[in-house]
Curated annotation (Swiss-Prot):
Quaternary data: Monomer.
Region (G3): 57-60
Name of this protein: GTPase Era
G4: annotated segments: 116-119
Annotated organism of origin: Campylobacter curvus (strain 525.92)
Length: 289
């Protein structure tokens, strides 16, 4: 019996959260085509035959001087030391530079290199890309192609991961999907809805606080606050006649309902907290770093 923690590392938009959701066969992690949508670690628990893998989805590695982004990067780097093993995700469309930057961080734990989005390229291009990464074969334990669209890729990856786990009793009940508080998952789903319905800087200068969750017979009531930096942002989040916040609510409710399988009532308020994304204390309290 093996059990351990595996951090999912990669640049922004490499497909880390999509991979976690695919392995869980359930959506619990925020997914967006916009960069840096993942701000918090989230754990997903996967059983592979008799072994238990606790995946830790992390913010994407990137370069920024902004306080919020620096804290996100620190969270990802810290997870590299707190785990038993890692998987580094590299898109098949990218060159090897992001992986080289990861190696320059001098990771101490063993890692598997996962090539994502392989369904989007020809076999010839995939083989060419794998040959490029073979130059680093002394650094990784395995090079595994992966596609979230094809389940046949999952078992080989899980088997390789389990080889790196220590002999250990299960950390969690095998029936558990995640140990992440449901409030945090709901919060991320609402944030995903903001990313999908608003553009420019607004999603990056906004966050969400889930203030209260009330479970009743047949319905879960969620009361949440969207926090943003400027009055103009608040107006745009609400939209003309409340149309934008209505779309955000519909999008978020659908995500939450798909996870909980129950009727959802979602009440969203919007408040302005000027400079929150530049205040380390506020960020740590809000996001949980």
């Amino acid at each position: 019996m093996r059990s351990g923690f595996v951090s999912i590392i990669g640049r922004t938009n490499a497909g880390k959260s999509s991979l976690l959701n695919a392995l869980l066969n359930e959506k619990i992690a925020i997914v967006s085509h916009k960069q840096n949508a993942t701000r918090r670690k989230i754990n997903g628990i996967v059983m592979n035959e008799g072994d238990q893998i606790i995946f830790v989805d992390t913010p994407g590695l990137h370069e920024s001087e902004k306080i919020l982004n620096k804290l996100m990067i620190n969270e990802a780097v810290k997870s590299m030391g707190d785990c038993d093993a890692m998987i580094f995700i590299a898109s098949v469309h990218d060159d090897t530079s992001d992986y080289e930057k990861f190696l320059n961080l001098n990771p101490k734990k063993p890692h598997i290199l996962v090539l994502s989005k392989v369904d989007e390229v020809s076999n010839e291009k995939l083989l060419k890309k794998m040959m490029q990464y073979q130059n680093f074969q002394s650094r990784f334990t395995a090079l595994v192609p992966f596609s979230i669209k094809k389940q046949s890729y999952q078992k080989p990856l899980l088997d390789e991961i389990c080889k790196l786990l220590p002999e250990h009793a299960y950390f969690y009940d095998p029936q558990f999907l995640t140990d992440t508080n449901e409030k945090e998952i709901f919060r991320d789903f609402i944030l995903e809805a903001i990313y999908e319905n608003l553009s420019d800087e607004i999603p990056y200068l906004s966050d969400v606080s889930v203030d209260k969750v009330v479970e009743k017979a047949g319905i879960t009531e969620i009361f949440a606050t969207i926090i943003t930096e400027k009055d103009t942002h608040k107006s745009m989040i609400i939209g003309k006649n409340g149309e934008t916040i209505k779309r955000i609510g519909i999008f978020a409710r659908k995500l939450i309902k798909n996870l909980t399988n129950c009727k959802i009532y979602l009440k969203l308020d919007v408040v302005v907290k000027r400079g929150w994304s530049k205040d380390e204390k506020i960020i740590k309290k809000l996001i949980g770093y």
